UniProtKB/Swiss-Prot annotation:
Residues 201-214 have a biased composition (Basic and acidic residues). Residues 59-73, 122-134 have a biased composition (Polar residues). Interacts with VAN3. Residues 1-38, 55-95, 122-153, 172-219 are annotated as: Disordered. Residues 174-183 have a biased composition (Gly residues). It comes from the Eukaryota. One of its GO terms (biological process) is auxin-activated signaling pathway. It comes from Arabidopsis thaliana (Mouse-ear cress). This is VAN3-binding protein.
Amino acid sequence: MERELRRPNPINSSRRPEIFSSGGSSTQLPESPRGPMEFLSRSWSVSALEVSRALHTAKSASATNRPPSSINTPIPEETLNPEKEECPPENSTSVSSQFSFAASATSQLVLERIMSQSEVSPLTSGRLSHSSGPLNGGGSFTETDSPPISPSDEFDDVIKYFRTHNTIHPLFSGTGGSRGTTGNGSNTPMAGTGPKTVGRWLKDRKEKKKEETRTQNAQVHAAVSVAAVASAVAAVAAATAASSPGKNEQMARIDMAMASAAALVAAQCVEAAEIMGADRDHLTSVVSSAVNVKSHDDIVTLTAAAATALRGAATLKARALKEVWNIAAVLPAEKGASSALCGQVDTKHSDSSFSGELPVAGEDFLGVCNQELLAKGTELLKRTRGGELHWKIVSVYINKAGQAVLKMKSKHVGGTFTKKKKHMVLEVRKDIPAWAGRDLFNGDKHHYFGLKTETKRVIEFECRNQREYEIWTQGVSRLLAIAAEKKQKSSMSKWMAP
């Protein structure tokens, strides 16, 4: 059975659907939606849009035999009958259910109203200092663009590297190749591991900054896309309200209220995008293209583009969080080291500031990354023996002697003075009752645990939720088990020694 495929001539401008013929019967395939592509080409290239308008203006001027004017020359959309801009009604009786597409004059008014609110906002003072990438007009946005790192930034990175490792001697001495850097910043002998060089450390920091810039650009692009959708909705709402002579007074008021609300939402979306770092010229160009939607294909295209941008930004953000969660947290026993901190922290994350919250990943998170998270520490509410409550930066790790250590740090006088206290942890208490009066502050979500120290004292802490409670109780329990195993192996090796 022969099958003939007839395709339209690409040179011919007329649209002809593809037809498959088989056995004398033909099947007509649906036409490809070219409207969205036409709108995208119009929105990507402002110059093409201006050329198209100029050609239409010249044709209309020659048809009416009137001299062209740079001020009063009507744009083709304005010369159309306003009634023709409405969607063709399926039911002529339901006039109130029709939506209209704005003419150029209405689109310009909507554009000015949307952009005028962000002009006077004190928050939109330009792009963020850490945002980069060509987010200006021209559509040359790429997620991989990043600014070159200045020499001053590299110098600061080197200083941070030296401060992290507390010394520069291992970098130039021959004995530094057999030493590793532990999570608390001290140098501890590591079997088969060497220090990370300055070049490697700087390269990791550059890659990290590039990923952060890429994520930031994706979020800005998503915000601009959402602002474009909101602007298109505002333009359609304004056109619908303007073309309501045949409606009753009640429906006209509803249309006006909807137009005002849509313009407000669009203005706030534009302002939010500019606060996130979007370039104002690029934002104006995008909104100007969005308010000139002429068909349902244009709105569908804007919506699909915004949804895709949001999904891409969410993917990059999830990737960044996954990289944070997958920091090297391999146990020293698994690496064959004789003594090292169990909660070893990767050097590329050792200079990160304290966030106050523990990141949470999948179900295997507790068994893989708890040691590092506990070594880095987080902010917990601690109750003293007198019943007072204080916020402490709490961390638990295994020291060189193989003991589980609880470290509590607090800042005083605006961070001028810092106090640190350390205790040896012997046991985890999970049967701590709820503190009196804490039920008034989301008490149903709070959980409590205690750590028994070498002085037989139980220090109580409050967790914000069940997940944080499991991280601390199970993580410290695992640290205690590892410390006991190391102690047992040490005693066995001493007993077996001649």
